[in-house]
Amino acid sequence: MPFINIQTIEGLLDKDSKAELFKRITDLFVEIEGKGNPAFREHVWIRIDEYPPEQWQLGSLSPTKQMIELMTS
């Protein structure tokens, strides 16, 4: 039973994007780990955790509200 935890910056994913991620990731795990057995779908757990931009940093760069707006527009 896989548990997939996605961590992302708050505001990057809308409801439709999250639904698409859930579907595609589940499909991938059914295909690979479940060996194509559709019943395996019931055992795939996925969680999306969103964190405010100020809780992220890459090197010395933290995302700003303007950066997020550019990425989502």
Where are these regions (language model features)?
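A domain-level signal for the structural core that forms small-molecule/cofactor-binding pockets
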Residues: P2-S73
